[in-house]
Curated annotation (Swiss-Prot):
Function in brief: Transaldolase is important for the balance of metabolites in the pentose-phosphate pathway.
Keyword ATP-binding included in the entry's annotation: no
Compartments reported by the entry: Cytoplasm
Catalyzed reactions per annotation: D-sedoheptulose 7-phosphate + D-glyceraldehyde 3-phosphate = D-erythrose 4-phosphate + beta-D-fructose 6-phosphate
UniProt cross-references to PROSITE patterns, sorted A to Z: TRANSALDOLASE_1, TRANSALDOLASE_2
Lineage, opening ranks: Bacteria, Thermotogati, Deinococcota, Deinococci, Thermales
Swiss-Prot/TrEMBL keywords: Cytoplasm, Pentose shunt, Schiff base, Transferase
Gene encoding the protein: tal
Entry's Gene Ontology BP terms: carbohydrate metabolic process; pentose-phosphate shunt
Enzyme Commission code(s) on record: 2.2.1.2
UniProt source species: Thermus thermophilus (strain ATCC 27634 / DSM 579 / HB8)
Annotated catalytic residues: K92
EC class of the enzyme, as a word: transferase
Name of protein: Probable transaldolase
Family as reported in the entry's similarity comment: Belongs to the transaldolase family. Type 3B subfamily.
Length: 223
């Protein structure tokens, strides 16, 4: 399973990319707005394009960039503009009627599409049939309403395997490291997570205790 970072912060991307384990990045309008607010920079079309280009050059893998339009025609136009920024851009569309229409057209043009805001296996099936390269079920948000995000992911992964659909599953809305383990065990192709969760994957108190003990023992006997 590949690991993606769900952020638009170049600083966070550079930090995790240095670990050598980062395969891609997912963004959305909220994350982009936060990144520009943190920089104190105006969010112009030119600045946005330059920012996305910098992300693509840093990570070297797929970077999902989401449209803000709601109608298919406008989604297609915006998707084309996003795809033109860098070859690694994947156009992110909402799983709606208009999103499906736009997905069909963009994918027919050779533009990769990530269908997002998926909360059912049927939505994932529709997205795959519309030509999506990726589908993104939201584990955390499903858990939030007392449903089972893991069960949703299991259904989608199994359905795609049974139907032999050429689409990758991105486990999204990851809230904690257990979600990552669950996604890997259930067969997700990718898990995308916030910077804080990515950092937590590495943390374990016994690792810190063990390292401290090794160093203390070495100090006692070193020449």
């Amino acid at each position: 399973m590949e690991l993606y970072l769900d952020t638009a912060s170049l600083e966070e991307i550079r930090e995790i990319a240095a670990w050598g384990v980062l395969s891609g990045v997912t963004t959305n309008p909220t994350l982009v707005a936060k990144a520009f607010a943190a920089k104190g920079e105006a969010l112009t079309e030119e600045a946005f394009a330059a920012h996305l280009r910098a992300i693509c050059e840093t990570v070297g893998g797929p970077v999902s960039a989401e449209v803000t339009a709601l109608e298919a025609e406008a989604m297609v136009a915006e998707g084309r503009r996003l795809a033109a920024i860098h070859p690694n851009i994947v156009v992110k569309l909402p799983t709606t009627e208009e999103g499906l229409k736009a997905c069909k057209r963009l994918s027919a043009e050779g533009i990769k599409v990530n269908m997002t805001l998926i909360f059912s296996a049927n939505q994932a099936l529709l997205a795959a049939r519309a030509g999506a390269s990726y589908v993104s079920p939201f584990l955390g948000r499903v858990d939030d309403i007392s449903w089972d995000g893991g069960e949703l992911l299991r259904e989608i992964v199994e359905m795609i395997q049974v139907q032999d659909l050429p689409v990758k599953v991105i486990a999204a809305s990851i809230r904690h490291p257990r979600h990552v383990t669950e996604a890997a065990l259930l067969g997700a192709d990718i898990a995308t997570m916030p910077h804080a969760v990515f950092k937590q994957l590495l943390k374990h108190p016994l690792t810190d205790i063990g390292l401290k003990r090794f160093l203390e023992d070495w100090e006692k006997v070193k020449p």
